Amino acid sequence: MIALIDYKAGNLNSVAKAFEKIGAINFIAKNPKDLQKADKLLLPGVGSFKEAMKNLKELGFIEALKEQVLVQKKPILGICLGMQLFLERGYEGGVCEGLGFIEGEVVKFEEDLNLKIPHMGWNELEILKQVPLYQGIDNKSDFYFVHSFYVKCKDEFVSAKAQYGHKFVASLQKDHIFATQFHPEKSQNLGLKLLENFARL
């Protein structure tokens, strides 16, 4: 059973509907105790890094997540802002500490790229590692992105990259911790396949 963490950061319903389409049992976790009854966790999110961390703290999710992920070793998937929160720090609205599951930081796309910010739309993945999330998904497949910030971290954690002015991290994996910068719930059949792969872990 997959807990979708509700910390007032959007796109929960679309993720829940995507899991329903593939027959994966899920529920909305509205408080930290709810995480105990799940065998997998999902941290969605759209919006500001700083505001999201503030909400997680106020709702009591930060310590609960660290317990469930780092001690209990439950698989977790972070989507978009959810992925970014896994890092040590972000710079949206000033320096802000993240969950620290993965070493690295979250920075904004440079303004001088002559590209529209946010990066919005379909983009091709360069899959670098055959991780469980990409089982049955071909390299150069397209997924849907909406973001103004991107992750900088060690290559050892990067499972895929995409290109927008320069190459950036499209997905991460560190042991049982998985994350995508793109939105699988908005990425049609391939996105459903990725969510199915996570549900089957």
UniProtKB/Swiss-Prot annotation:
Keywords of the record: Amino-acid biosynthesis, Cytoplasm, Glutamine amidotransferase, Histidine biosynthesis, Hydrolase, Lyase
This enzyme's EC code(s): 4.3.2.10, 3.5.1.2
Major localisation: cytoplasm
UniProt superkingdom: Bacteria
Gene Ontology terms, MF aspect: glutaminase activity; imidazoleglycerol-phosphate synthase activity; lyase activity
Pathway: Amino-acid biosynthesis; L-histidine biosynthesis; L-histidine from 5-phospho-alpha-D-ribose 1-diphosphate: step 5/9
Catalytic residues (UniProt): 80, 183, 185
Reaction(s) this enzyme catalyzes, per UniProt: 5-[(5-phospho-1-deoxy-D-ribulos-1-ylimino)methylamino]-1-(5-phospho-beta-D-ribosyl)imidazole-4-carboxamide + L-glutamine = D-erythro-1-(imidazol-4-yl)glycerol 3-phosphate + 5-amino-1-(5-phospho-beta-D-ribosyl)imidazole-4-carboxamide + L-glutamate + H(+); L-glutamine + H2O = L-glutamate + NH4(+)
Residue ranges of coiled coil: none
InterPro entries per the UniProt record, alphabetical: Class_I_gatase-like, GATASE, Imidazole-glycPsynth_HisH
Lipid metabolism recorded as keyword: no
Boundaries of every Glutamine amidotransferase type-1 domain copy: 1-201
GO biological process, one term: L-histidine biosynthetic process
Intracellular or extracellular location(s): Cytoplasm
Cellular component annotations (GO), alphabetically ordered: cytoplasm
Subunit (UniProt): Heterodimer of HisH and HisF.
Role according to the record: IGPS catalyzes the conversion of PRFAR and glutamine to IGP, AICAR and glutamate. The HisH subunit provides the glutamine amidotransferase activity that produces the ammonia necessary to HisF for the synthesis of IGP and AICAR.
NCBIfam families hit by this protein: IMP_synth_hisH
Protein name: Imidazole glycerol phosphate synthase subunit HisH 1
